UniProtKB/Swiss-Prot annotation:
Ranges of Basic residues composition bias in the record: 1216-1225
Calponin-homology (CH) domain ranges (all copies): 1397-1504
Classification via Pfam families: CH (PF00307)
Basic and acidic residues bias locations: 208-222, 337-346, 362-371, 465-498, 1036-1164, 1226-1235
Record's protein name: Calponin homology domain-containing protein DDB_G0272472
Biased composition annotated in UniProt, kind: Low complexity: 81-107, 234-251, 263-290, 315-332, 395-438, 500-516, 531-557, 1165-1181, 1189-1206, 1333-1355
Amino acid sequence: MFRNILSWFDSTPQPPPQQQEQQPEQPLEPPKVVSKNEARILTDQLPAPDSQRSQRYDRINNNKNNNNSNVDPLGNKDIFSSSPSTSTTTTTKSSSTTTTTTTSSSSNKQQPLYEDEPPLIVHELTSKGKRPPSPIFKEESSSQLILDTWEINSSDDESNSKNDFKGFMSQLESSNLNEKYITSNIYQKYEFFQKRDSEEDLFPSPEPIKKKQSNDLEKNIFDDDDDDDIFKNKQSTVTKPKQPQQQQKQPIVKKKVEEESLFGDSSLSLDSPLLASKSSPPKSSVNLSPQLFKEDSFDIDSFLSNDFDFKSKKSNNTTTVKKAVPISKSKPQQPPQKEEIKEVSTQKDNSNSNNNNGWVSVDEKPKERSTSKSKIGIQKTVTVKSNNSFENDIFGSTTTNDDGGDNDFSFTPATTPSSSSSTKATTTSPSSTTTTKSNINIGQKSNKSVDQADQFLNDIFQQEEQDKKRREEEAKLKQQQKQKEKEQIKDEIDDLFKFSKPTTTTTSTPSKSTTSIVDINSIEKKFSKSAANATTTNNDNNNNNNNTSSPTNKSTNLFNDWEKEEEIKVKEELDKKKKIEQEKKLEQEKKLIEEKKRIAEEKRISDEILAKKQLAEKLEKERIEKELEDLRLAKELEEKRLLALRQEKELAEKLKRERLEKEAEDKRIAQEIERKRLEKEKQDQLEKQRKLEQQRLQKEKDEKELADRLEKERIENEIKEKQKQLEKIKLEKELAEKKEKERLQKEADEKRIADQLEFERLLKLKQEKELAEKLEKERLEKEAAAEEKRIAAEKLEKQRLEKEAEEKRIAQDLERKRLEKEAEEKRIAQDLERKRLEKEAEEKRIAAEKLKQQQELAAKLEKERLEKEAEEKRIAQEKRIAEENRIAQEKKIAEELEKKRLQKEEQDRLAAAELERKRLEKEAEEKRIAQELEKKRLEKEAAEVKRIADEAAAAAKLEKERLEKEAEEKRIADEAAAAAKLEKERLEKEAAAAEEKRIADEAAAEAKLEKERLEKEKRIADEAAAEAAAALLQQKIEKEKEERDRIAKENKELKEKEDKERKEQRQRERQEKEQERARALKEKIEKEKERLNQQKLDQEKEEREREQRERKEQQEREENEKQLEKEREEKERREKLKQRNEQLEKERQERFKKDQEEKEKQLKEQQQQQKVIIPTTTTTTIRERSNSDSDALLNLPDSASSSSHSELVHLTLGRSKAKGRKKPTRRELTKDGNRNKQNIPNLKELKPSTVIIPDDDDDQSQKQQSEEVEEKPVAVKKMPIGFNPGMMMPKFDPSAVKLKSSAKPPSTNTTTTTTTAPQQPVQFNLKPVALKPTVTQTTTTTTTPPTTPPSSSVQLKPAATRSFSGSSFMGINSTTPTTPPTTPPSLKKSAAKDAGMKALDVLLQWLKDQTAGYEGVNIKDFTSSWYDGIAYLALVHRFKPSLIGDWKSFPKNDRVANYKLAFSLAEKHLGVTAFIDADDLAQLPSMERLSNITYLSEFFKVMKRGGF
């Protein structure tokens, strides 16, 4: 159903007063008011749509949806989507073409109806020359203002069409068109009140309506004020011939139009007239601009004389009102005979076909509009009518609101008689007519009053037949009259309408021209271009046919006037257009330029902001870095200050510590005793636990054996009742086959005997047979009773087992939950304890590092005081070294004890694991036996074998998971033990140098940790055992449950079988039982064989696993033994080396005495003979003495020389760069040949590195010497006396002295040369200072090592026959063997140097052995082999692989980073003092040999002291 009935006024501007005066004044009849009730009755009579119409409606609706058209313009939805539309009316006169194009646009904004204003106001306002208000939306598209029409289907028959139409013709009344005051275009809209709120598209199909021509058009139909001048002169130029009076009042006959219908059906058409109106809605009027009339001429009188009819389906004469139709459905209509039809020529821009949605447009180039508007062209074809009466037409003016509400229908018929006279001026040509389709649809029909509609249709069709006849007569008369008129004015206007440009009309009729006839050729030349561009192909043909006629004076004057006016107007419009276009272009260019400038400015501003931000960030970063550096420096100063204070406090408490050392030792001994006691208690506790575990296992074993025995007895009793031979097979598995054969043979004999007896019994009398049957029956009853008793006993036993299993399961669940809760609590407590310990360890580490730094700084502050108290400190140092050696020895003993304890714990753990494994194996075996016993009872289940296999697989999986879990727990326990061990060692190292209270606290903490660890291990073991027991119990309960279900099922089956067996014959039952027994026995034998095979396989598998575990354990034990053996061998080797060194030391001391005496003699002689120093001789002498002293130093035993290494820290720490250093001045020699001591700032600070020369018979001095060479403990790292971070090798700069080769001494056979090689480091040899020196020399030499490494072989020979061949040290080759004490001093020096070289060879060989196999490490010397730092990392990885991880994947590219990492790891985790600074090494072109030897010697000592 359609919702609304549209009605509005076409708003056009009023004509000027002059034009109104020229037009004849005619009265305007008031509009007829139609009440609301009458309108409701009329709308209720509309018929309902049929199925065919609904299908067409769907099709049209789809087309409109595809063309972006909305539903109903009358139902508050604009079908044009608020787009502009174009309606065109074109009239062709004679052979010329006159086209009138009307274009109007409407905005998107809709105005409400004037609901409260009565329709009579329209008449009053119109009579006063004012514009009436619009009763409908003020902004509607022009296509909505044209007419609502619909298309019908030509295939529908006439009867259906008559039946479908209802209640519309009753609204038609005769009306005449007022030519001057055309009040409105009347548009009727209907609404069915039942479905007025529907939002559907209610218009099934549009239909085009034909419209007749009219030769008169009021100027005021156009809303554009700019077009007023066009129509002012038009009325005077158009001739309006008069018509006879009898034709004015002839009724108009409505005829059907083929394929058109008001409501979309196929049988009926309904038309609404288009009336030109002076007043139309604001912003919704038809807008005709002058541009539209430049291409085709327009005849106003012809348009005003147009009439509107309803056409029947059978009518051949078609009248088309201005209407929009689809291009695909536009078909020319054949006019009746002798009737001229004016053709509408349309031109459509193909480029706008998509926007026009398939409608024909007359605009060749439509005006540009906004994107929200569309362009719609309307094509009109009108036919001539005899008069202008509207007797059967739609009422003139109607108003209604959207709700069908308060306003009544009204109409104003046009009765102007003069309008008919204008039809004489209209001529038509028999060209093809074109119909167009409107996209305005009316809704569906009502379903009410169908019978009344049929009756009313019959009356309408009778009236239409009469109208048809009258129309034919009128057409004939009109055709004749038009033909005469055409002949009269054909020659006059032939050339006038050749062009399509509209002319501006004047207010007066032009007079006849007296000028000469216009030259046609000149006119054609002047206007041919505009005519060719404006007209269509058909119009050109018509114009060419009519160019032959000669114009008159009247037409010439008219043409001249029109030509001038048109030419001026066209030029003005072209100028305006060009100017507007130029302005638009300029504006666009300006906008583009401004946009580019704006974008460039924005980009510039953004770049500046970004640059400022970056600069600010950079400055802020620099400021922050500077602040951090200041904070760091302030922090360092504060730390130095605190360190000084702490050093003072430590020095004050030093005496107190010495006093408390003895007490600490007593407490340590007590602690050791307490530790041993705790270990003993722990062992006792473990022994008790082991005994309790053994007792528990024994008890469980006894219980299980008892249960097994009872079960076996029960099974044996059952088997004895059925068959005695089966018991022998079960008890003696090895003789199973043999006994089975015997049993089968026995059964065969029994059967044979029974058969024989039976045969004999049959031969006997019948009494014997009856007796035998009676005996058989009694036997069967006894067996049945025994079987029932057995089943009852089994049932009771099963119920008891079920109850016990349920109780066990509940208890197990409770225990499991408790254990889980306790485990979670323990885990949380352990995590907290671990975090606490980690935090404490980190704090202690930081404190130790700070303490170390403080000690370093304190050494510098104590420099002056230590100089004054050198002798006292020396004595204290000796005591301290002795005490440290004692502490180290005790620590070593403690470490050995701890190692033994750990080994014992490991053995205990392995023993416990072995016991646990055996217990689990035993439990598994017992479980397997129980499973086998249960399996034997399941004799009749064929699928039992598969189920048991699945259970065994599941049990194996659970066992595997349990073992993995135990292994994981073991690994965690081992890691925890290792971590505890490391923590304990670190605490012990810190406790060695701490106070008494600290030592006691750490001992207590250690005891507590040990106790917690033991408790943790115990808890873990208990939890593991509980979890394993719980898993086994759960598994056993599940199996028992499955067994109960299976037994219940078997019992049910047994009962059924017994019921069946009772029905069978007794004899056959006995035979079947015997067969069943034999078969069951055979199956049992097979199952038993399979079980034995499976058991054998399981045992073999367990044996293999046990063997593998034993092999692993054996390998571990062997490795441990090898390690212990290696350590013993190393210890023995060290002892031998120590003995050898002691012997060498004795010899060296003897040589040293003699050598000193000779030196003193030589020096005295030189002082007497020489007063001036000869540089060359002095340098050579100093070098020789330095070599001798260095050899003596390096010839010390391992234990003795190691103490000197720690005192050489001044060689590397705090060294400044050699580059740019100011060369020192040469110092004068004293009388004794030494330099001035006060000019050597570090000479006093160097601690003597040689031992005291004892007397030959002084045993006490020998003992003191041996104590001096003892190793210091790792925990306490003391700096040497007089240590200063800025100290160097006593501030000697090799670049300050130009070394020269000296002459060989005459008394030596040793060749001493100074060689240099490119890219080799400079080496420095320090002068060893004796405790009781007689002569002090500072010697230096500069040599380069050979490219080949020294000999790595170390051969120990007796002292009397030992020789050192092929040794090299610092580039000085020596082949001189050792000589007895009577040899000259030069030979003694050479022998001492060879001994020193042998010590370096030992160190080098040890380093090679430790780094063997490491990729990228090849140690050949003490310089170039260590340059990249990888060798240091290899040493750290050798003794602590966990610190570095995988050696192959570890990055080793950065040299300085390798130095820092290796030195820090060695100091922190191995206890090797970092004598070498990585930053100083980075500045040197190569390694410094002596510094590297010092560090590596310290590394060697620490590793040997640690037992590696």
